[in-house]
Amino acid sequence: MDEVLIGEVIKPHGVQGEIKVYPITDNPKRFRKLKEVILVQNQEQRRLKVLHANVHQSEVYLTLEGINTRDKAEAIRGWAVKADRDQVPPLKEGWYYFELEGMQVYEGDVLLGTLAQVIQTGANDVYLVKGDKGEICVPALKTVVKHVDVAGKRMDVELPPGLIDGEELR
């Protein structure tokens, strides 16, 4: 099953094993609906039931089955927190970054490369596309991104004039 990175364990909270999690989302309230998380560090994975999730502003606190002391919570400090893809609610519009990363990006029939990273700039996101000829920063604008096929892992773009030297990639 596909897993999605949703946060990182920052530190224990209290003495009964509750953990503070740094959420990797713009909506931390999503943690309240989780039934289970996967804690990951290096090659080790632990799948644990979520007993309670508390969200205060942008801070997330989780109580997990089997983590019931401060020492056990301390032992998972720095671990990645993941969830099964089917626990991530669909967006009303748009895509999650993890759905975009790894897509093949095309302009017409020309493969520009693979979308390696979504960069948040404030004004609009930028897609960092890495290909045989180097890196291209593609603005995430409706005028540029013409089609996204999440299932097919393909994005079609129409680059603005002057963004790249067209002959370099063709």
UniProtKB/Swiss-Prot annotation:
Record's InterPro entries?
A: PRC_barrel-like_sf, PRC_RimM, RimM, RimM_N, RimM_N_sf, Transl_B-barrel_sf
- CC per GO annotation: cytoplasm; ribosome
One matching Pfam family, short form? PRC_RimM
Which NCBIfam families does this UniProt record tie to the protein?
A: 16S_RimM
Q: Which family does it belong to?
A: Belongs to the RimM family.
Q: Show the PANTHER family listed in the entry.
A: RIBOSOME MATURATION FACTOR RIMM (PTHR33692:SF1)
Task: State the name under which the record lists this protein.
Answer: Ribosome maturation factor RimM
- Annotated organism of origin: Desulfitobacterium hafniense (strain Y51)
The lineage, from the top, is:
Bacteria, Bacillati, Bacillota, Clostridia, Eubacteriales
